[in-house]
């Protein structure tokens, strides 16, 4: 399991930080993404929809994905 905290990052920086981690994930691996900005959540979820990742859970300020 990987953990990424993008709290305090601007939307583009948050997305790029998450993407760097996601591309090196192994099949079946999970990533826990914590964020603060609602716009970061929106942009991260838009990126996830364009790629082959599974949303496991979405809670307040936490997104859990799997490859």
Predicted regions located by residue number:
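Loop/helix-junction capping segments adjacent to catalytic residues or to phosphate/diphosphate-binding pockets
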Residues: 12-15, 38-42
């Amino acid at each position: 399991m990987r953990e990424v905290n993008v709290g305090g990052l601007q939307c583009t920086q948050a997305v790029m930080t998450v993407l760097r981690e996601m591309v090196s994930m192994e099949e079946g691996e999970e990533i826990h993404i914590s964020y603060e900005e609602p716009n970061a959540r929106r942009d991260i979820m838009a990126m996830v929809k364009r790629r082959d990742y599974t949303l496991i859970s979405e809670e307040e300020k936490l997104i859990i994905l799997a490859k």
